[in-house]
Design a protein with these regions (language model features):
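The feature marks cytosolic C-terminal regulatory regions of anion transporters and related permeases
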Residues: 363-530, 548-551, 555, 563
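Short secondary-structure capping/turn micro-motifs that flank functional sites
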Residues: 332, 518-519, 538
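Short acidic-hydrophobic, aromatic-tinged amphipathic segments that line or gate anion-handling sites
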Residues: 530-546
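Active-site donor-binding loop signature of nucleotide-sugar glycosyltransferases
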Residues: 234, 453, 539
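Conserved SAM-binding loop
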Residues: 77, 511, 536
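Transmembrane helical cores of multi-pass ion-transport proteins
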Residues: 1-426, 494, 506, 526-527
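Generic hydrophobic alpha-helical segments
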Residues: 88, 169, 463-467, 543, ...
């Protein structure tokens, strides 16, 4: 069993004691391999996000190193991913590049707080229809942003809005570049063939080097990184603190939450994939802290938001990575490219990168999940469809917010269907099931009701059935809570209101059998003041005994009855 200190140590530190030359060689091979795979992806994500390609490489170097060095996963690879493309585009369009840097740092702080407070496990509570909906939507948007480069269209500006973007593309189809289209579709075909038949061969590397060589050798008339961006500078930029704009901090909080939640979801999903492939078990809280530190640091070097990258992580594991050192070597490999081979990168054709991103969009789309979603309830289908639609036509922040609200209402509705408030009748006592009331006759002066399931907001109205015909109730009403699995403030208030109604009619309410969570919460809320501590019993036998004591005393006439 790990010590409390070890629970907060990065995997890189925990695995150092068993590190050796054999593991280093394996990490070196895997790190260089995944570094070469990451190069075209980092540039493609940056260009798709509306920033120069070096921003993606800087992000991959800085965050890739920090996430591996400080994270809670053995083989996780961090860096820019397709999930952030749409968000980054929207933030830059609204707040500019400094707004993006500020938003990324805010998201980093939120991720650190989530890790420190132990919220790493909270990601599992995101409903599947919401996750599938926004990944479907992001995939559609990424593909739509790459149509211009895939077909070599001459467009000065690509609108940020989906429908305006598609309209502008349709208007400029006459500018299609046949050579660029061929390069783009050949690149996409190579990616598909590698994924289908040559799973151990990184298609992105073949496409990047092959297309670059073809453009250089045959002088193909296609747009390249150099013709659009003027090449990539050698070396890392100087550390620069972004210009913080205090008046925008409140406006940036909402997109920062989106970046943080999206980063947390993707990084922990990626870590789970890594665990399944490597047989390891990641530490979600340490992983979130590392993700946060990486996102706080990335903007200082002009980098993008980052998270765990599922495809690169899988490549890392398949390439034989043994420890987080492989992830650090991946970052150093990218640094070596920037330092010694930056001039060569300018010849990479944008059509080839578009082909790579089309494949990325397809892979991240979770398309196989759609038939499964369609088998679920109408509410789940509505949550998925609305999240997908809003992601495409509005923005990801709104899509996730609306999706989560609808999913919450769906959850409440499903919970309400499982909670019952029913009277314990003779049929219940004699139905043959083993329970404490078996073979015991309930006196006529007692009515026993049981609450079965969670008694939370949204279901508390069911208790009103008890008092629908209050005049017909006997003098004593016992509420049995043995099968009530949970309660909240609304549930306690409903029980208090029931007690008040019964007391006003001259009746006595007893409660019994509360489980630890409901009992503790009811005690903290001062529930005893409403029914009397002597009327809260541990079990039904005590409640029946207490009822007999009350019945044996002279009592005034019950309201609503006649003598």
């Amino acid at each position: 069993m790990s010590s409390p200190i070890e629970a907060w140590l990065p995997k890189s530190v925990l695995l150092l004691r068993e590190y050796n030359a054999e593991k280093f060689v394996a990490d070196l091979i895997a790190g260089v391999t995944v570094g070469l795979v990451a190069l075209p992806l980092a540039m493609a994500f940056a260009i798709a996000s509306g920033v120069p390609p070096q921003a993606g490489i800087y992000c991959a170097i800085v965050t890739g190193f920090l996430i591996s060095a400080l994270g809670g996963s053995k083989t996780q690879i961090g860096g820019p991913t397709g999930a952030f493309v749409v968000v980054v585009l929207g933030i830059i369009a609204r707040y500019g590049i400094d707004g993006l840097f500020t938003c990324t740092m805010l998201a980093g702080v939120l991720l650190v707080v989530m890790g420190i407070t132990g919220l790493g496990g909270m990601v599992k509570f995101f409903p599947r229809p919401v996750v599938v909906g926004f990944t479907n939507g992001i995939a559609v948007l990424i593909a739509s942003t790459q149509i211009r480069d895939l077909f070599g269209l001459r467009m000065e500006h690509v609108p940020g809005d989906f429908f305006h973007r598609m309209g502008a593309i349709a208007e400029n189809l006459h500018t299609l570049n046949g050579v660029a289209t061929a390069v783009g579709f050949i690149s996409l075909s190579v990616m598909i063939l590698c994924a289908k038949f040559l799973k151990r061969v990184p298609g992105a590397i073949l496409v990047c080097f092959g297309a670059t060589a073809a453009v250089a050798i045959f002088h193909l008339p296609v747009e390249t990184i150099g013709t659009r961006f003027g090449g990539i500078p050698s070396g890392l930029p100087h550390i620069a603190i972004p210009r913080l704009q205090p008046q925008l901090l409140l406006h940036l909080l909402s997109p920062a939450v989106t970046v943080a939640m999206l980063g947390a979801i993707e990084s922990l999903f990626s870590a789970v994939v890594s665990d399944r492939m490597s047989g390891d078990k990641h530490n979600p809280n340490v992983e979130l802290i590392a993700q946060g530190v990486a996102n706080i640091t990335s903007p200082l070097f002009g980098g993008l938001p980052a998270t765990g990258a599922i495809a690169r992580t899988a490549t890392n594991v398949r390439s034989g990575a043994k420890t987080p050192v492989a992830g650090m070597i991946h970052a150093l490999t990218l640094l070596a490219v920037i330092l010694f081979a930056a001039p060569l990168v300018k010849n990479v054709p944008l059509a080839a990168l578009a082909g790579i991103l089309f494949m990325v969009a397809y892979n991240m789309g979770d398309w196989a999940e759609i038939p499964e979603i369609l088998k679920l309830s109408k509410m789940d289908i509505s949550v998925w469809l609305l999240t997908l639609t809003l992601t495409v036509v509005a923005d990801l922040t709104l899509a996730v917010e609306v999706g989560m609200i609808l999913a919450a209402f769906s959850f409440i509705r499903k919970i309400s269907m499982t909670t019952t408030v029913s009277k314990v009748t003779d049929e219940y006592i004699e139905d043959g099931r083993a329970h404490i009331l078996q073979d015991k006759a309930i006196p006529e002066y007692i009515a026993v009701y049981r609450i079965h399931g969670p008694f939370l907001f949204g279901v508390t109205d069911k208790i009103a059935e008890i008092t629908e015909d209050i005049a017909s109730l006997p003098p004593i009403v016992i509420i049995r809570l043995r099968n009530m699995t949970a309660i909240d403030a609304t549930g306690i208030a409903a029980l208090e209101e029931l007690a008040a109604q019964l007391q006003a009619s001259g009746r006595t309410m007893l409660v019994c059998g509360a489980r630890p969570q409901p009992a503790a919460l009811m005690h903290e809320a001062g529930f005893e003041r409403h029914v009397g501590g002597e009327n809260i019993c541990e079990n039904i036998n005590q409640a029946l005994k207490r009822a007999a004591e009350i019945h044996s005393r002279p009592v005034p006439a019950i309201a609503g009855t006649s003598c």
